[in-house]
Amino acid sequence: MQKIETILSDGNRELKKNKIETSNLESQILLSFMLGVPREYLIINSNLKLDDEKISKYRKLIKRRSEGESISNITGKREFYGREFSVSGNVLDPRPETELIINIIKEIYAKDVSCSVIDLGTGSACLISTLLLEFPNFKGIGTDISEDAINIAQKNAKEYLINDRVSFIVSDWLDAIDFNQFDILISNPPYIPREELESLPLEVLYNDPLIALDGGMDGLEHYKKIASNIKNKNNDKEKFLIIEIYENTVDDLFHYLENIGFERENMILYYDFSNRKRVIVSK
């Protein structure tokens, strides 16, 4: 038997030893997950003693995290824009940097406006779900090439009671979709150049599906598919294309977009909270 505060201290120390930067937070997340209680419970009940069986289960979770398995893979959850979303090894872990897309759309549109949005490569559907939760009159579609990802997306939409405003389709980008029915297109496509994949942090390679990372030889393969499809189908109705980008290839991407007819003066580059080039918005 040990007190919760002692158990957490041991977990924190073990994670810190294995260079987990947010060791204190993650030790709490894992114990709250194992006990099925909110983290606040651990603080309020820090003197509560747990039996050896629970301690053993917790240490196994700490070991998995120390060996490089992500918190989201262990718990099946990931926070995005202040909400928890179900995830799995079949979808990219939502990143806080991607929240910039939500903030940009909140700058463009009033909260009560009605808009239709399509989320290409929806994965967990954290983006389109968050938009529909922030904008009660938005509706939309999420697409993904992976049926497993679509299943996770549907689960999250149902969890947040927005499944009457969003549907999900298995599609390779815009192949099965008429883009002209939407006001906003959002996407966080795979953008890592193939030769750079091996240099990614082991935690990323260990936990995220390769299909959600691999941007082809130049990192632009999927942008080209999306952008060329838009140009082929566009009926000149004003829309917003909002895409997450990779800082190392952004100049090449701008060059490509201009070559196929996107006007540079209609494209805006946004920086994230780390001052990295992160999102392009085009009208």
State what each model feature region is:
Residues 54, 94-97, 222, 249:
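An acidic site on a long C-lobe helix of protein kinase domains
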Residues 1-75:
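N-terminal auxiliary segments of SAM/dcSAM-dependent transferases
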